[in-house]
Amino acid sequence: MHFETVIGLEVHVELKTDSKMFSPSPAHFGAEPNSNTNVIDLAYPGVLPVVNRRAVDWAMRASMALNMDIATNSKFDRKNYFYPDNPKAYQISQFDQPIGENGYIDIEVDGETKRIGITRLHMEEDAGKSTHKDGYSLVDLNRQGTPLIEIVSEPDIRSPKEAYAYLEKLRSIIQYTGVSDCKMEEGSLRCDANISLRPYGQKEFGTKTELKNLNSFNYVKKGLEYEEKRQEEELLNGGEIGQETRRFDESTGKTILMRVKEGSDDYRYFLEPDIVPLYVDEDWKARVRETIPELPDERKAKYVNDLGLPEYDAHVLTLTKEMSDFFEGAIDHGADVKLTSNWLMGGVNEYLNKNQVELKDTQLTPENLAGMIKLIEDGTMSSKIAKKVFPELAENGGDAKQIMEDKGLVQISDEATLLKFVTDALDNNPQSIEDYKNGKGKAMGFLVGQIMKASKGQANPQKVNSLLKQELDNR
């Protein structure tokens, strides 16, 4: 028997407002524990929540960017549960009347475009954070009350690979809107995954399992891959899948049972009596719609149609707004479009991954990268020299040409000097001359490599090729 995988994702996104969802406390990451709190966050008796207008605006902006319908009437509800980092013993959320519904995003997997539906986007407040030690627990309520949006996909995802692509696209869109930085390492984007299997051709869904502790997109993919195999083996052996919540163990790559999954009835949702229902008129919707910036799909189309970039380049460059803005800044400073794309996808990305930093953490600017690329383009700097100059540029900034001169890496363009390298290479490799004359194209490349090696990468490659061809034809 063959099974079809059905996946739905619930993504929590922290809105980067200055204050919290229902209180004036700061909503900033990294503060001293319990320093960003007040009487509302601590649930003192008699205090009343006040809705953060900007958080509502940003929830609407995100909904619109995800092609959702904005509800004219929505409301807040109490989600009741007991936990030490939830001082009210309930969380203010939206149960049956969310701010956004019926959206979608398009993803690309293996060259195919697929539309993934989005059921809803609702607003809620975050809980605090518990840290468990040996024999005791610590509670930090700085995060309590931070504005969140929860984005719930339709069960349209059919593989872990599609789930990864969905998350990548969703993060990209939200980052472009400016409502969140979507940093998983800081908790501003968190994902829970629901997965079930059913025999191919069956319409009814199987029993779903919820996965938690998915701290990166890669862990989401790995957790789903493991759970897919686990459920398939269980079903093929005649077993049943229980409705469970399981935790992904990063060290083993397996999922571990946490608890039997609760249903919505367990939370005893009811209307939040201290907050009036939201009424969003058409004027309010129109004002928010005007704030939506250029989104990744629009930029991608512009890069392909107007700048002539390949689809792949355009896709990679628009994955993050930071990279896309940097690319546009560099070409605005006169850098060649394709060379800039190659450097950002190649040398720049390699440097960022190796050092585990983002562009903003380096001394790179669109201007100084463009300066280096223009030197490559006009032949002043070879690609080999650029690879030696680039790390210095990224770490300390400055001017690429000055770095090249300070390091003694100035490209050799003097013909007499280059001719000496060329004749030495030919004298030392007579077999390559014979190979060239016999039509073996690789011989030319080998000789160029020998010349570049002898000149420590400083020979002007264009002039080397020209002189080498002349000398070969004369022998």
From Swiss-Prot:
Provide the GO biological process annotations.
glutaminyl-tRNAGln biosynthesis via transamidation; translation
One GO MF term: asparaginyl-tRNA synthase (glutamine-hydrolyzing) activity
Q: What general EC class does the enzyme of this chain belong to?
A: ligase
Q: Protein name, please?
A: Aspartyl/glutamyl-tRNA(Asn/Gln) amidotransferase subunit B
What gene is behind this protein? Answer: gatB
Q: Does the keyword Ligase apply?
A: yes
Entry keyword set: ATP-binding, Ligase, Nucleotide-binding, Protein biosynthesis
HAMAP family assigned to the protein according to its UniProt record, in alphabetical order = GatB
Which SMART domains does this UniProt record tie to the protein? GatB_Yqey (SM00845)
* Assembly, per entry: Heterotrimer of A, B and C subunits.
Query: What family classification does the UniProt entry report for this protein?
Result: Belongs to the GatB/GatE family. GatB subfamily.
What is this enzyme's catalytic activity, as reactions?
Answer: L-glutamyl-tRNA(Gln) + L-glutamine + ATP + H2O = L-glutaminyl-tRNA(Gln) + L-glutamate + ADP + phosphate + H(+); L-aspartyl-tRNA(Asn) + L-glutamine + ATP + H2O = L-asparaginyl-tRNA(Asn) + L-glutamate + ADP + phosphate + 2 H(+)
Query: What InterPro entries does the annotation carry?
Result: Asn/Gln-tRNA_amidoTrfase_suB/E, Asn/Gln-tRNA_Trfase_suB/E_cat, Asn/Gln_amidotransferase, Asn/Gln_tRNA_amidoTrase-B-like, GatB, GatB_C_1, GatB_Yqey_C_2, Gln-tRNA_amidoTrfase_suB_CS
Q: Which organism is it from?
A: Staphylococcus sp
